[in-house]
Amino acid sequence: DIDLEINIPNADISRLSNYYPKSIGEVGLKWLDTSLLKGLASNTKIIIRGNMQDFPFVDKENKPDSSEGLFEVTSSITGSTIEYGTGWPNVENFDIDVMVTGSKIELLSKQGHILNNEIVSFSGVIDDFTKEDAYLDINLKTNSFLDKMLNAINNSPVKKVMKGTSESMKGSGPGQLDLMLSIPLKDTEAIRYTGSYFFNGSSMENQDLDLPLLSDIKGKLIFDNDDISLNSGRAILFDQPLSIAVKNKDKATIMDFSGTFDSKFVATKFGDEWSNNIKGQTEWQGRLTLSDKESDLILSTNLIGLSINSMHDLNKE
């Protein structure tokens, strides 16, 4: 049997590998060695008691079993950089509390950023690090201004599901990201994710794809490995309220719009010469189909409620 307690006041996390029990398993050790890039671990305590043949001292339900032994690790890590998955931006300036009990690893944080997207809360769990198919499950919330969110998207696998529409997108204004990641430790390229981005009065445009400036955007964009969607979104276009819905279809992203067309709308886009000859208002609908480097816009209206005068052949009453 072994009865060991190690206390490490301060240590560079890249050097903690000297203290990892080999019984953690090849998959877990590889992830620890390649993912913890830098940082300072403080007040690290490692306790191992029992026969190492029974490590990590859990029962059949993967619960700590004191009759078998004890394995616990606690540590507070500050200023760290962590590479949690291939192709994803690193977590930087990351302060995190680490707790290991039996075969379960728990990570908690409220400090750090991902490409300047400020972390509000972070929790990660590896339920059983001894399994060959061990997973790290992460729940993450960030305060993300839209320009910083777009930068993160364009430097992550989420860019693929955006069908080429995010690359030249410009954005500003507040928002919040909720993201769940499931990371197989033996293949960090095979991450599954699902998330949502809350527009809290943001603005965006994509001149390359003829998407005009949308301001005061409010709504919830939902996305995963395969799709994106937004229902019942709201925005302002040319000083007029607008309803928005977004979905993916085949190799394109489709944005459906509906709004009100009146003289103010026309003045904003075409000038007073046109708007002075328009009275009333009418509803209109539009569909903007966006794909990599291409866009297609279809607009329609029945003109009910609108009168157009003194415009040659366009007179309508």
Label every model-predicted segment.
Residues 87, 110, 209, 233, ...:
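Surface loops and adjacent helix of pleckstrin homology
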Residues 11, 78-80, 117, 202, ...:
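Solvent-exposed loop/turn tips at the surfaces of repeat/solenoid architectures
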Residues 3, 91-95, 121, 214-218, ...:
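Transmembrane beta-barrel architecture of outer membranes
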Residues 101-103, 224, 249, 291:
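Structural motif
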Residues 3-68, 72-82, 129-192, 196-205, ...:
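Extended amphipathic, helix-rich lipid-handling scaffolds
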